[in-house]
């Protein structure tokens, strides 16, 4: 069986930074370190950090006084930041810098007097954080139909921002609908999109031209991993999302001569290796890494940890 590995795949710079923040905090301050929400959406990563002394909570009320606290890569609402400050909790902010950039874009648009529209998935932690960071009501849209259902007058000055785990391709139709709907509209430069989201989706599109089956390594609650699976399916290739090798169903590969493997931005390479090993237990496997866009982006750590 020929196995093609998509490039790039797996961890993005924001995820690497977030995990390193927790690990360095544990080294510097000692366990426990409290993390609000899953640091990234991957059970393996979360369990690994738990084993090192991290404690994951959903609300700050679960954090003891004076305990070192980390905000997840998805970002948090201002109310969460204010609660942490009121309790005098020592906070390390692992919010992805590209998410913070979206927060700042939204604030600038509000300052200009524009009604803000967020393109994203309801209930996603990043969306909740972004809506809670902007000091004004935000309209959330997830589809062209929801754009058409907006009751704002056509001449309302509006601006849009997008969830970072959505690519240019994911948002293109919604943005076009917004531009057709409103006469005075602004949005971020296309260069401001999350590089990792776009690169991984483009790699899956390339992969889909070569293989009979696509396996996406990632968590069920990972937005970007689910989207990679959808892209494979949309390209007409049988595509499956799996957390690790234990979830591999041999039936998926029964008639496949070529299999493509990729991983969401929060999935570590060790899980890709685990899936390949599971395939080897089914039959002989020859692995080839496809050429793709090289990523050399690194994000700086918080000052409190940079020198540790």
From Swiss-Prot:
Keywords: 4Fe-4S, Iron, Iron-sulfur, Isoprene biosynthesis, Metal-binding, Oxidoreductase
Record note on cofactor: Binds 1 [4Fe-4S] cluster per subunit.
Active-site residues, as the UniProt record annotates them: 126
GO biological process: dimethylallyl diphosphate biosynthetic process; isopentenyl diphosphate biosynthetic process, methylerythritol 4-phosphate pathway; terpenoid biosynthetic process
Listed InterPro entries: LytB/IspH
Catalyzed reactions: isopentenyl diphosphate + 2 oxidized [2Fe-2S]-[ferredoxin] + H2O = (2E)-4-hydroxy-3-methylbut-2-enyl diphosphate + 2 reduced [2Fe-2S]-[ferredoxin] + 2 H(+); dimethylallyl diphosphate + 2 oxidized [2Fe-2S]-[ferredoxin] + H2O = (2E)-4-hydroxy-3-methylbut-2-enyl diphosphate + 2 reduced [2Fe-2S]-[ferredoxin] + 2 H(+)
Gene3D superfamilies associated with the record: 3.40.50.11270, 4-hydroxy-3-methylbut-2-enyl diphosphate reductase, catalytic domain
EC identifiers of the protein: 1.17.7.4
GO MF annotation terms: 4 iron, 4 sulfur cluster binding; 4-hydroxy-3-methylbut-2-enyl diphosphate reductase activity; metal ion binding
Cofactors required: [4Fe-4S] cluster
Broad EC category: oxidoreductase
Pathway the protein contributes to: Isoprenoid biosynthesis; dimethylallyl diphosphate biosynthesis; dimethylallyl diphosphate from (2E)-4-hydroxy-3-methylbutenyl diphosphate: step 1/1; Isoprenoid biosynthesis; isopentenyl diphosphate biosynthesis via DXP pathway; isopentenyl diphosphate from 1-deoxy-D-xylulose 5-phosphate: step 6/6
Annotated [4Fe-4S] cluster binding sites: 12, 96, 194
Purpose of the protein: Catalyzes the conversion of 1-hydroxy-2-methyl-2-(E)-butenyl 4-diphosphate (HMBPP) into a mixture of isopentenyl diphosphate (IPP) and dimethylallyl diphosphate (DMAPP). Acts in the terminal step of the DOXP/MEP pathway for isoprenoid precursor biosynthesis.
Family affiliation: Belongs to the IspH family.
HAMAP family according to UniProt: IspH (MF_00191)
Protein name according to UniProt: 4-hydroxy-3-methylbut-2-enyl diphosphate reductase 2
